[in-house]
Amino acid sequence: IIIIDKVLEECTYNSKGLVLEKLSYLKEKDFLKAAKVPYKTDSLIAPSPAKLLRQLENQFVNNIVRRQKELTDTEFENQKNSFLNDADMKQIILCLNLIKNGEQVVLVTEETESSNDNKLFKKIPAICKELEIETMTLPELIAKYDGIDVDFQ
C-alpha cells in the first residue's frame, strides 16, 4: 500500500481531518519515516508524458463542461496543469510507472466512473479504464485479500 504526499495532504483538510484523527499514526514522524510514507510525487513524471498530455486533452476532458465554461486556451491550460499536479493524477501517474516496471497495481478509490460533478476532467475510474489500470473500492480490496483486516472503533 502506497500513500502519496498529495493524498496525505488532502486528508488534513477533507472532512475536517477525520482520516488523520482516526488513523493518528499517519501523523507520527517515526511511523512515517519507517514506512517511507508519504511517497513523494514532486518529481514524478509519466512514462510517456507527451502521450498522457494528448490523452488528457482529448480523452480525459469533459468537453461538454469545457464548452459550458467557455474556457479560453490559457484558462484550459491552467486547469490542465492544476489537474496534472493534484492527488488524482499523481496516483495515476505513479500507477503507470509501477506498471511499466512490472508491478501488479490496483488503485483504491471511492470514486465511481460515472458521476463527474460537472468537473472539467473525468474521474479516476474512467481515466484508469482508458489506461488499463485496475481500480477497486476499499471494501472490494478487503474482500479480495484475506490478510487485510480493518477494525472500526
Regions picked out by a protein language model, each given a short descriptive name:
Residues 1-105, 113-114:
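Active-site-proximal, substrate-binding regions of enzyme catalytic domains
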Residues 86-150:
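Acidic, metal-binding active-site segment of PIN/NYN-like and related structure-specific nucleases
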